[in-house]
């Protein structure tokens, strides 16, 4: 296209105006600024000039006693950086609770919670679950005797008819006759024992994670149920009173005033 333009100029006798190049003596200063470069530089300068002019005007017109809500909802660090304060909901919600915070997710969360509970019950039965740390409280075995002398002379090895090494077991506790009359079937080598222990630890770790996940899903269900109840009673004149604030692993507690049904 440019060749056609140049041909048309030649035919019409129009003079070609070429841009002047940098003289050889000033070659060290680089190429001369072209018109397109000047236009970009001028537009950038004018844009910055207008922006500074607007900012100066807004600063002159600003009221010193002006109030804005963001002044209360933000803070400034020692290095001068600004940041927004977290709201109460953001401080008391985990990542999962934020993702499943809609009432539409209530039935889905209930379904996943039931699945987790079923899986936990299956794993407890499979692993002969007896870890008190996951139950939240320690297990105790109380034995009642008739007299104080029996309590003082009480020997758990005699009572349970087992050895000292078996007393700490809360399940599958072998008796003395089992050691005498039966052959205890176990692993043949130390490597098999270590392998079985690794498998057992892996299963217990999975169980611990599932218990924690079930606890968090239960909290999500509680918070969604509370949100549903608050939304249902939003048109009522008797508003519920908050008794306890919500936490990351606990829903808020509200107290409703009894409303007589018509």
Curated annotation (Swiss-Prot):
Pfam family, one: Utp11
Keywords per UniProt: Nucleus, rRNA processing
A single GO BP: translation
Domain of life assignment: Eukaryota
Subcellular compartments: Nucleus, Nucleolus
Compositional bias annotation for Polar residues: 1-14
Transmembrane segments: none
A GO term from the CC aspect: nucleolus
Bias (Basic and acidic residues) ranges: 19-33, 56-69
Cystine pairings recorded for this chain: none
Residue ranges, annotated region (Disordered): 1-33, 56-80
Subunit-level organization: Component of the ribosomal small subunit (SSU) processome.
Family from the record: Belongs to the UTP11 family.
Functional summary from the UniProt entry: Involved in nucleolar processing of pre-18S ribosomal RNA.
Name this polypeptide is given: Probable U3 small nucleolar RNA-associated protein 11
């Amino acid at each position: 296209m440019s060749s056609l333009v140049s041909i048309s100029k030649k035919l019409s006798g129009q003079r070609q105006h070429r841009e002047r190049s940098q003289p050889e003596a000033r070659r060290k200063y680089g190429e001369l600024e072209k018109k397109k470069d000047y236009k970009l530089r001028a537009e950038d300068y004018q844009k910055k000039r207008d922006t500074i002019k607007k900012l100066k005007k807004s600063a002159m017109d600003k009221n010193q006693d002006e109030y804005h809500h963001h002044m209360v909802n933000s803070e400034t660090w020692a290095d001068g950086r600004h940041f927004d304060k977290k709201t109460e909901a953001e401080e008391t919600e985990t990542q999962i609770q934020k993702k499943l915070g809609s009432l539409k997710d209530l039935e889905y969360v209930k379904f996943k919670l039931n699945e987790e509970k079923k899986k936990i019950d299956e794993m407890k039965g499979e692993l002969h679950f007896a870890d008190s740390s996951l139950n939240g409280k320690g297990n105790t075995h109380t034995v009642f005797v008739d007299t104080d002398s029996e309590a003082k002379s009480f020997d758990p090895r005699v009572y349970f008819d087992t050895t000292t090494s078996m007393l700490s077991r809360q399940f599958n506790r072998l008796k003395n006759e089992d050691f005498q009359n039966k052959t205890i079937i176990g692993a043949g080598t130390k490597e098999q024992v270590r392998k079985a222990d690794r498998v057992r630890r892996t299963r217990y770790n999975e169980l611990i994670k599932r218990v924690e996940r079930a606890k968090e899903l239960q909290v999500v269900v509680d918070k969604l149920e509370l949100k549903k109840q608050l939304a249902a009673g939003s048109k009522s004149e008797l508003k519920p009173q908050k008794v306890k604030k919500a936490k990351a692993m606990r829903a808020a507690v509200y107290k409703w005033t009894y409303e007589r049904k018509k």
